C-alpha cells in the first residue's frame, strides 16, 4: 500500500491559517487585564497557582516552568489532585489562574467553590467573557477567540498557540518589572546551553595570550600578513611594549586598505590602517555580554580580551568560531 503523500497546498493552507490566527491575536488582544494580573503577582508574596485541563494544562505547566526560572513562586496543580488533598497548599490571598478556552471546563468549575472557601483570588484566562468560569472569577483575562486548524474546529492548535503567547507575555512583564538579572537567571538555570550562556565568562572561551597574534604600531602591513598566516585568527592585535591594546587589524581592514591604497598598503605601518579603539571586553565579563557586543548592528568576529578597563593589557582573544563550536550562537 503506497504511503500517503504530503500536499504542498495543504502545507501552505495550514501555515496560512496559523499566521492568520496569530495576526488576529495581536490585533485583538487587550493587555489591560494581563497587566492587572501582573500587578497582583508583583504585590503578592505567596504562591501563584496555574491550572488547566488537557492541552490548556500543558500550556499552564510550561508557563509555570518559565516563571520558576525567573524566581517567581509559581506552581501547577491538577484540578483532580487539588480536590484530593492539594487544597492544603492554597492560603488566603494566593492567586489561582485557570486556563480554559471555553470557560466551561467542568473539572475547573468543580474547584471554584473550594478555592473561594480558601479566599484565593481567582483569575480566568479564557476566550469566552460570558462563561461560567469568567462569571465566578475575580479577574478575567480575555484571549481573542481563534479558529483551530482542523476542519472540525476541535483540535487545540491555534488556541493553545495564543495561550502560549499570552503566557510568555505575562512572564516577560514580570521579568522586566522585577529587573531579573543575568546572574539570577543563570543561577536558576545552570545546565545546558542556556546555563553556559548565562553563567559563562569570557575567560572560559577565549584564546589565551600565548595564542594571540600580536603586532606593534610601527610594524608594516606586510609583516602583519605573516602573523595572520601563522595564527589563522583573521586579525592581529596591535599593542605597545607593555601589551596594552592600541588597536586591531582584521582581514576586513586589509580589504578596505587594499581598496584605498592598492599594492602600496604592504609598505604602510599598521598605525595608519588599523582600527583604533576597537570593541573589546574584559576576561571576567559575562559571555552573554560579549555576544551582544559581537552581534550588534555592525557585527565583529573577534574581540580582544583585556585584564581590566584600567590597565588594558591584552590577555586573550575571543573568536566567534569558538562560540559557534560551543553552541552559543
UniProtKB/Swiss-Prot annotation:
Keyword Acyltransferase: no
InterPro entries xref list: CBS_dom (IPR000644), CBS_dom_sf (IPR046342), KdsD/KpsF-type (IPR004800), SIS_dom (IPR001347), SIS_dom_sf (IPR046348), SIS_Kpsf (IPR035474)
Recorded GO MF terms: ATP binding; isomerase activity
Gene3D superfamilies: CBS-domain, Glucose-6-phosphate isomerase like protein, domain 1
Keyword entries, A-Z: ATP-binding, CBS domain, Nucleotide-binding, Repeat
Protein's GO biological process: carbohydrate derivative metabolic process; carbohydrate metabolic process
Binding positions for ATP per the UniProt entry: 52-57
Domain of life: Bacteria
Presence of the UniProt keyword Phosphoprotein in the record: no
Residues in CBS domain copies: 206-265, 274-329
Domain SIS, first and last residues per copy: 37-180
SUPFAM superfamilies for this protein: SIS domain
Family from the record: Belongs to the SIS family. GutQ/KpsF subfamily.
Name of the protein in its database record: Uncharacterized protein CPn_0526/CP_0226/CPj0526/CpB0547
